[in-house]
Amino acid sequence: YFEAMLEAPDMAFLGVRGLLMQAIRRDDTREALRLANQADVLRPGTPWVLSKLFELQAGAQQWEAANKTLLQGSGAKNAQTGRRRRAVVALALSEEAAASGDHKQAIKQARAACELDSHLIPALAAHVRHLAAAGQMRKAAKTLLAAWARNPHPDLAAAFGALGGPDEAPLDRVKRFQSLYKARPDDIESRLALAEASLAAS
């Protein structure tokens, strides 16, 4: 039925939509991606098509394509969702760059993810990790302390702990964690992070 609709120019889009929904229901990602791209060619910029295309591309870890889809307008109906999605894509691109040894691109994409969504903890932790991997330890610590002051989180405490390296003396670690505590002394996460560092030193 849907295949027959493809033959009529005025019905082709509806036919592609029907086939796309069938492909999604049977978990045929490759076919669903092909059909979503075809739907976008037939009616460029259709919000539901772009949203579905993004979801499929992200699920297949096609981050460059997902980024292009987002720039084309996915998430435009909800600006916050659009920014969050773009942040997630930037984070994924950051991790890909890091895996290939491109620290500069990894830092750039992680920073972009943080700018798009300052509450995306994995992006903040990745930004710090990539700065440290590039030997920018002071900048990594400064970035993390600023993020901690806004939004204390156990994953940020773990990233801060990793900045000391495996050979850091326990008392030096406690001193470093005191600066984390001072960035947000009123928060329970600050007290927990300092307590854990102190316990490890005793």
Regions found by a protein language model. Name each.
Residues 1-202:
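Repeat-based scaffolding regions
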